[in-house]
């Protein structure tokens, strides 16, 4: 079945069959000629009611013949992304065909992504690898395999490509280093889910001396296939997937469509293959800039970190939900003035939660520790990452004046991503 839709067709279907889009497009004329005529989705409104899949107003049809995945948070608190089976097949086929750019005939690929608890990454990668037109071999280990067993299997079976999330690849690299091992037969490390930074690349190079490092591609379980990774892409760069969706970069304050190269804005996706759960001008949560001029086929763009209003933030294998963190801060401190600052020291992520006490509810000595404990309870992975020296969590009470604001709008930024992304040093086109 053909699941690709022209824009007008998609908009008409969404407004007729989705309560959310009927309201969202209420002031839009029946016929449109460009995306710019349509309002950008507010993710908070989009995901309202998504916990009740039988009555979620975004959906255009009953929940039949579908796949359900989790997008961030715990199973009970997280949001869900839904695909008709033919939509899923279109997604993995398009993504899989893009992998031909990164794989060679005879490659033996270890799939080290994670499975279970409604996570999509392992299943998605497995299904996509099945669509690669080059002859390859997949070893579907998952990310739960013991490091010793994995290292031995790589040697024994001459596995030369490792595909996984950066935090797991780094954890495996740390184990290899601690045990005095290097895997010279590995020729490629393909990562997804989070950016890799210079200090982390150096750690990988020490134990995988002959491996090139590249993104496997840019996709998310909510927005779908967002960017293809080609050999001419530097770290952090991808190419727009023509035919699968339409990418826009918008000014974060004015909403103006950005066409020039090098100017950073928020990345917005219109997916042309999704009917059950349409995504029309949906902010994916990342900032980006164009690397090539308008009209370029498969136009290249560079990721530049998370948006300040992102609905979720990735730090290694950890997915943080800013809205949930804000609710925790308010419950414990009585204050709505807080900021999450993400930095990096060598190969370790530094996560700092700054909060300012309300004038009517002054700070108490126990609040920082209570917040620290509450975050670990909400995100148990923090304890594991801290033990592996991959993450440091710090809580600090501060004055409200110390919380950073956007230099143009003056708005409070709840998420401040200060990590230096590889794409930030590239020149403009």
Model-derived features with residue positions:
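AMP-binding/adenylate-forming catalytic core of the ANL superfamily
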Residues: 162, 268, 273-384
């Amino acid at each position: 079945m053909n699941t690709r839709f022209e824009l007008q067709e998609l908009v008409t279907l969404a407004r007729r069959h989705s309560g959310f889009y009927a309201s969202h497009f209420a002031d839009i004329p029946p016929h449109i000629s460009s995306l710019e005529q349509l309002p950008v989705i507010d993710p908070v409104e989009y995901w309202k009611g998504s916990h009740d899949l039988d009555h979620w107003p975004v959906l255009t049809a009953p929940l039949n013949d579908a796949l359900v995945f989790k997008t961030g948070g715990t199973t009970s608190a997280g949001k869900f992304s839904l695909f008709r089976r033919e939509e899923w097949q279109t997604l993995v086929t398009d993504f899989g065909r893009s992998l031909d750019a990164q794989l060679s005939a005879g490659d033996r690929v270890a799939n080290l992504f994670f499975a279970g608890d409604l996570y999509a990454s392992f299943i998605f990668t497995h299904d996509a690898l099945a669509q690669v037109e080059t002859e390859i071999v997949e070893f579907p280990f998952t990310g739960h395999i013991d490091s010793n067993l994995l290292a031995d299997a790589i040697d024994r079976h001459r596995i030369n490509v490792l595909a996984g999330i950066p935090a797991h690849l780094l954890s495996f690299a740390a184990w290899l280093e601690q045990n005095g091992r290097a895997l010279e037969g590995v020729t490629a490390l393909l990562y997804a889910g989070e950016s890799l930074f210079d200090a982390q690349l150096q750690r990988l190079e020490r134990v995988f001396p002959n491996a090139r490092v590249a993104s496997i591609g840019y996709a998310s379980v909510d927005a779908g296939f967002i960017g293809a990774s080609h050999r001419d892409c530097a770290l952090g760069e991808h190419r727009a997937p023509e035919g699968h969706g339409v990418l826009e970069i918008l000014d974060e304050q004015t909403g103006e469509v950005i066409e020039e190269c090098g100017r950073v804005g928020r990345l917005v996706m219109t997916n042309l293959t999704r009917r059950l759960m349409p995504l029309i001008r949906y902010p994916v949560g990342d900032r980006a800039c164009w690397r090539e001029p308008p009209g370029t086929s498969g136009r290249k763009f560079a990721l530049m970190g998370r948006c300040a209003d992102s609905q979720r933030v990735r730090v290694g294998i950890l997915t943080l939900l800013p809205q949930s963190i804000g609710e925790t801060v308010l419950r414990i401190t009585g204050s709505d003035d807080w900021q999450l600052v993400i930095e990096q020291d060598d190969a370790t992520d530094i996560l700092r939660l700054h909060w300012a006490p309300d004038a009517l509810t002054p700070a108490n000595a126990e609040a920082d520790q209570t917040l620290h404990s509450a975050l670990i309870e909400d995100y148990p992975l923090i304890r594991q990452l801290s033990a592996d020296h991959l993450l440091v969590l710090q809580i600090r009470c501060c004055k409200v004046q110390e919380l950073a604001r956007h230099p143009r709008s003056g708005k409070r930024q709840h998420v401040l991503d200060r990590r230096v992304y590889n794409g930030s040093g590239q020149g403009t086109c």
